[in-house]
Each structure stands twice: as C-alpha cells, then as structure tokens.
Amino acid sequence: MTTYKTLFLTRRAPVHQKMALEAAPEILKIIMLRDANKESILEHIKDADFLITEREDPIDREILEAAGRLKLITRLGSRVWDIDLDTARELEIPVCRLPLNSCIHVAEHIIMQMLTLARRVRECMNVMNTREWDKEPRLCTEDLFAYNWSGRTGMRLLWNSTVGILGFGEIGNELAIRLKAFGCQVSYNKRNPLPRKAEVSLGITYQDKETLLKDNDFVISLLPFIPGTEKLVNDDFFNSMRRGSFFVHSGGSGVVQEESVIRALTNGQLAGCALDTFSWEPVRDDEPILEPSRNFKVNLVLTPHVAAGGTDIQKANPRTVYYENIVRLIEGRPLTHQVV
C-alpha cells in the first residue's frame, strides 16, 4: 500500500492531537508538530506529500520552495492570510481552506450569550414564569396593547457596541465576521498580532490587554487553558474592566476564577456574565457559581460546555473531514474550498 507523508502543524493540546491522528486514513503517514519552529518545518517539509496547518505563523516562500514533493496544502479554518498564496500559485501547489463547523458553532453561541445578557433574557423569562406584574390582562387590538407590562429596565443593545476579543484564533475570526452585522466595533488581543491585511479584511483593530479591558462594552474571552492562563480571569482582571460592562467566556476550562465572577456581579463591576466552561466539569453540586445562577435577577448565563454543539453535531462532523481534500486529490476528484 502506497503511503503519503503528511505534515500536520498544530498548536492543540495532546488530547486533540490524538483524536486527529485517530481520524487519519491509513494511507497517510502523519508527522504532527506542535508549535514547531521554522527550522523544524523546513526539515520535515522537504519530502512531505501533503501539508495540513492550523498554525498562524507564515507558510512563506522559503517553506514552499523547500517542499519539493508537496501536492496540497489544507488550512484548517477559514483564514488563509498566513499562507503565501502567490508563491503557492507560482509553484502550482493547490491550497484549500476548511471552515471548521465547531468554530462556527462557538461563534454563534457567543452571539447568543451576548444578546441574552444585553436583553436580560433570563429575567424576562422568569417574569413570564412567575407572573411578576400587577396589571390586569386586556385583549389586544390594533390600538390597545401593553408594551413592557412588567416594567423591565436595564436592557441594552448589541448594535454599535464595542467588543474586545481576548485570544483571537479561528473562533475569533468567525465571531468578528458575525459581529459586523451588528455594527460592532471589534478589537482583539493575542500574542502575535494579525497581519494588517487580515485586520482590514475583518474590520478589527489590535489593542493591548489593558486598553481592551477598560475600553469595551463586551469582553469576550477565547483564551485556551495553557501554562500561564489558569485562573487568569480573576479579581484583578474584572477590576480592570469598564464598570458596568459584560464578560463572556467560551474559551478553555480552568481559565476563569468563578468566585471572582460572583464578586464582580455582586458589586456591580459587571453588568452581566456568561460562562460555557468551568474549573470543574461537570460542575460540582456545591459549586458557588450555581447559587447566583438560581436568582433570575442576577444577569448570569451558564451553559454546560456546549458552545461547540451537542453530541449529534460532533458525530455529524467527524475529524475525518480534515483529510477529505487529500483523499479527493489522491482519487482524482474535485477539491472543495479551493483558493489556489
């Protein structure tokens, strides 16, 4: 059986690497490199048949010219600005992108979290369930109705809000695209700023962390759980934010200090908070964060680590899709999402 050397560049944790490897077809000999430096890439690319990349450092002319056998580049995600497309075109190396279903799910979940906080949806739902109003019902007509009959206050718009995103990867990319439709002014912070052309394309601007925290109506955390981020979102973090702003976290588990969330909501530093991941999962029965969530007047939205979709979604979008275009090329079938 003919096998093909496939270089897989990633920044993901070992558990995700293992799942990606298990999904690979037998005909592929996968060399997976995490956070590889350029020298290592140049060494392995020389005899590679295929390249799969989800890293953000450039796949530049030097790397492409060193790839004497390369037949295809697959970029996991929607972004391709980290690949020298002109050189790929010149060397006749096809490039395909692969929009990740899971990242799109998370981006939509975050929009839901933001709207739920801004419109105080939990409080409004509780009003309906508990009949918290003192007006007598009347049959509505064209001219007779009772707008806001329960007297809700504090509802805000997502439209034209300032939004700061911490940890800008594929999810941040998908989120920024969707926030455009709400007229939001989006800034971001990450270890290595994006190329200027990427910022212009997405309509986003880079901010240092301190400025991002204090200048935005919404702070969205997509930070992964890696060395240096454990409990990074704590009292100091929230006290650095604009008073009365919103905080949303759909990043890695273990990044947020939940007790700090409670304090920030109690003292009014936060107008609302939404969390999808937690320090303990499943959440322990006596976890302090559960207590304020039982009070519907506290603007706290908790979801059980489902931003990427349910088990049915995961089964419908297996990791074998990472290798789909490689198999298509080997079998002589048309490629999908081809950009070069």
Summary of predicted features, one role per range:
Residues 107-126, 177-184, 321-333:
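Oxidoreductase and adenylate-handling cofactor-binding alpha/beta cores
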Residues 8-9, 163-165:
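Hydrophobic Val/Ile/Leu positions in short beta-strands of Rossmann-like dinucleotide-binding domains
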Residues 1-48, 187:
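N-terminal glycine-/charge-rich "phosphate-binding" loop or analogous flexible N-terminal tail
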Residues 34, 76-77, 93-104, 251:
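Short beta->alpha connector loops at strand-helix junctions that form conserved
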Residues 99-162:
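Phosphate-binding beta-alpha-beta segment of Rossmann-like dinucleotide-binding domains, i.e.
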Residues 171:
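Hydrophobic/small residue at the entry helix of a nucleotide-binding pocket
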Residues 244, 250-340:
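Rossmann-like dinucleotide-binding domain for NAD(H)/NADP(H)
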Residues 46, 58-64, 191-288:
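Rossmann-like adenosine-cofactor binding region
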